[in-house]
Amino acid sequence: MDLSIPNPVADATRQVEGGSPAGGQPLEIDALIVGAGPVGLFQVFELGLLEIKAHVIDSLKVVGGQCVELYPDKPIYDIPAVPSCTGQELTDNLLKQIEPFEPTFHLGQEVSVVERRDDGRFFVETSLGTRFITKTIFIAAGVGSFQPRTLKVDGIDKFDGKQLFYRVKDPSRFHGRNLVIVGGGDSALDWTLDLVGKAESVVMIHRRDGFRAAPASVAKMKELCEQMEMQFLVGQISGYEEKDGVLTEIKVSGADGVTRRLPLDDLLVFFGLSPKLGPIAEWGLDLERKQIKVDTEKFQTNIPGIFAVGDINTYPGKKKLILSGFHEAALAAFGAAPYIFPEKKIHMQYTTTSPKLHKVLGVESPVFD
């Protein structure tokens, strides 16, 4: 089971590392999408059908959002006409679908400034200094940027990235090592099961005997414990020991009042990811429980020209489904068109029959006898 995440930006898209063009002038664009998850990617597609080119910003360094950050190899069953696909496969297919529109990605950066200009457009600047003047903004940031929930033990953060890890990028790095894995969710169980037999030893720690993970994974973990392939302890990490700057032991306080000392090479902590709206919360948008209120005609916010699609928005009857986000992206694209083409009447066309859309998509129009 390889859960490492490659950078999946397709060849037909452009990725920009940051900074504005030569001369320091902002990029003047029609549409800026904040969030490169499935809904943000489909927003590129829907805008592309209307001949609107998009730039995409994401705080992660890879495209895919929650799908590749949380469940790249887990099956998704509720995408229409796709009986089953993984989060990574869904992302790859969406990237393939948007290739004709050649979006530009600005990864590893967050929007830090949004200002309305006198001409109705928006000035936007990112944390890396990339600047835009855009006619429309689409917020497709899921539930915000994700940060791992960290282990609250004084001083242990000094080992972060050396012997303390909150994500696994290269599983082989832990082969032959003595591991302690902490957590009670799917990520903790998945990595425990994957690394047993590859690591020198595995001890799993959770604060209680109940789990928030798939029952089959829990059963398999307990079976491995019975076979003496690994150990499981109920308790919480309360301290550690180091020697010459190297983490050598952790202290685990159990419910029985006993503190145990565990030698280790690496500590893997999976307490989940904490979603944060970040700077979006300061844009002057109407919020309800950290979600952006929108209308259901165009999924526009209280600020004309700014739209919100996917899990980050809220409206009566809202369901947090990828399917719902795709629907919202389609209507948001049509809602944005008048800001970009104020003199142009937008006609409804269908990809099955429209020669114009076939040209936009780079496909041949079918000829029927």
Curated annotation (Swiss-Prot):
Assigned EC number: 1.18.1.2
Region Disordered: start-end pairs: 1-21
Reaction(s) this enzyme catalyzes, per UniProt: 2 reduced [2Fe-2S]-[ferredoxin] + NADP(+) + H(+) = 2 oxidized [2Fe-2S]-[ferredoxin] + NADPH
Database matches in Pfam families: Pyr_redox_2
An example Gene Ontology molecular-function term: ferredoxin-NADP+ reductase activity
Binding site for FAD: 58, 66, 71, 111, 146, 311, 352
InterPro entries recorded: FAD/NAD-bd_sf, FAD/NAD-binding_dom, Fd--NADP_Rdtase_type_2, Ferredoxin-NADP_redctase_2
Keywords from the named record: FAD, Flavoprotein, NADP, Oxidoreductase
Signal sequence region: none
Cofactors required: FAD
Lineage: superkingdom: Bacteria
Top-tier EC class: oxidoreductase
Co-factor note (free text): Binds 1 FAD per subunit.
Family the entry assigns: Belongs to the ferredoxin--NADP reductase type 2 family.
Subunit structure: Homodimer.
Descriptive protein name: Ferredoxin--NADP reductase 2
